[in-house]
């Protein structure tokens, strides 16, 4: 099997396609959460702690000189990113927890016993015939 055909067989497998879809949806979800945190959560939080905008929090290590830009430790963006991560992690936790509950409910549902095989049916018939013969 050639390299190209092996790659094609690998690429069209369900797991690879599912993973690609998951990555794309995850990236879109990340943008939604970043917007939610930056535009909805952080402004009121900044108001509560005295009007601080987290994205602007920084420590200047070295002032700008001539053409050289300032060296800045932008810890506000880091705080923003940590909050994004925590919200995404919490959302994933809730989703996984819901899936696990659904799986538990499926596992708890009693399943019907499997239908007897043809061999089992024949053995039961033989057993029943032997019982009736022994009684007469």
Curated annotation (Swiss-Prot):
Main location group: membrane
One MF term from GO for this chain? mechanosensitive monoatomic ion channel activity
CC annotations in GO: plasma membrane
Pfam families of this UniProt entry?
Answer: MscL
Q: How does it sit in the membrane?
A: Multi-pass membrane protein
Transmembrane stretches in the record are 9-29, 78-98
Per UniProt, subcellular location reads as: Cell inner membrane
Listed A to Z, the keywords are: Cell inner membrane, Cell membrane, Ion channel, Ion transport, Membrane, Transmembrane, Transmembrane helix, Transport
- InterPro entries reported for this sequence: Mechanosensitive_channel_CS, MS_channel, MSC/AndL, MscL_channel
Do the record's keywords include Protease?
A: no
Q: Check the record and name the PANTHER family matching this protein.
A: LARGE-CONDUCTANCE MECHANOSENSITIVE CHANNEL, MECHANOSENSITIVE CHANNEL MSCL
This molecule's function is given as:
Channel that opens in response to stretch forces in the membrane lipid bilayer. May participate in the regulation of osmotic pressure changes within the cell.
Q: Which family does it belong to?
A: Belongs to the MscL family.
Assembly and interactions?
Answer: Homopentamer.
Q: Write down what this protein is called.
A: Large-conductance mechanosensitive channel
Species classification: Bacteria, Pseudomonadati, Pseudomonadota, Gammaproteobacteria, Pseudomonadales
User: Which gene is annotated as encoding this protein in its UniProt record?
Assistant: mscL
